[in-house]
Amino acid sequence: MAIVITVLAYFCVLLLFSHLTARKMASNETFYRANRRSPWYMVAFGMVGASISGITFVSVPGMVMRTDMTYLQMCIGFILGYFLVAFLLLPIYYRYNLTTIYGYLQQRLGERSYKTGASFFLLSKMTGAAVRFFVVCILLQRFVLDGIGVPFWVTVPVMVLLIWLYTRKGGIKTLVWTDTFQTLCMFAALILIICQVMSALGMTPSEAITAIANDSHSRIFVFDDWMSKQNFWKQFLSGVFVVIVMTGLDQDMMQKNLTCKSLREAQKDVCSYGFAFVPANLLFLSLGVLLVMLAQKQGVALPDVPDDLLPMFAASGVMGNLVVVLFTIGIVAASFSSADSALTAITTSLCVDILGRKEDMKLRKRMHLLVAFVFMLFIIAFKAINSTSVIDAIYILCSYTYGPLLGLFAFSLLTKRQVNGRWSPWVCIASPLICFAIDTLTSQYVGYKFGYELLMLNGALTFAGLALIKKETVKYKQ
């Protein structure tokens, strides 16, 4: 009962934020860009939480079981990636005064390339966000809600409805403030869980830091094995490209950054939260090491699936009801701060990029409701499929859609050529399919399994395809 009361109180606070930020008549400009009046430090803090999904909240502590703390190598790459986004991409987005970042493709490559880029974003974001939210719903159902008799078919509609309720008026303006609150809740829950684990281990903070540093799972850097996926340079470069593509070329991740008052403030915002990812993920990984120590101390067998490490202790009640409540708040805060911005970004892209009716408020309201409804249907469909392998395949295939976005933007930025718009959608469809075939064949016949480097190959194939198709004689718009 305490969990239900806590979560309801949490949602009441979100609805209060929504009411306060949308008291005056909220226009489409407010919904899409918050009238470009957002304080950069609020955006920066909220973006840390928005970038950490509920899956991340659960998965990162479990990573130490198999790969120690080597994930921090990728987080170091994130820093360079965010600097590149801040000083290469943001100036372009602000120069063109864009509502959605895909408007740049319209300026540079024409209408069809513009629609293609936006369509790939919509496909990837809707499916990817639904899969992530589905996994979080399953975790909450399995470890918390089943125990108090709440069925899955009630959980999903209620959670999606609540997201729609607090975003329907203020949109991105509301999210700047709610994401700040949710990030605060997430880190408060994380730190309090760490304190509870230290208490169970009988350690002071300084003793815990020493124990973590001396533990075999505290390994961060891998320089000596070039074949390992955890090799520093592979992880570092992957971190750079992941940020450029999955943040810099993603309307969901960039929309709040475009609400800052000026380019300079937006750059401060992006660089600030770029640095924050190293200490943030260090906390998650440190929790993972402490949980492994606790399992050894209590003689508890570690789970076969690393993602179950935190839920095994935090949601099972082994460490008390307080930790269960904290775990619930943490995972809800992390998942909501990701899902709410995804639904807002999808609505924005649909109205502005696909339908071309930026000023139509009635359409925007209908599209926002429709997006929430389709999002709910996707989650229920994943539950009906009830096959981990099928859902994983869907998620992997949708992740391939970021490659064409990388290729489209790289071609636009690095060349002054125009393309034959008739063929650009086919190039963007062919590149992920070729990558999927290459990945399957190399895995089957060579034994090599691509990681994040497949994203770079995908982008390179798209770039090459765009270079091959017939140029149009349209003057490049400076």
What are the language-model segments listed below?
Residues 62, 66-169, 257-396:
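Helix-loop-helix junctions that connect adjacent transmembrane helices in secondary transporters/permeases
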Residues 7-18, 82-86, 121, 138, ...:
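Hydrophobic core segments of alpha-helical transmembrane domains in multi-pass membrane transport
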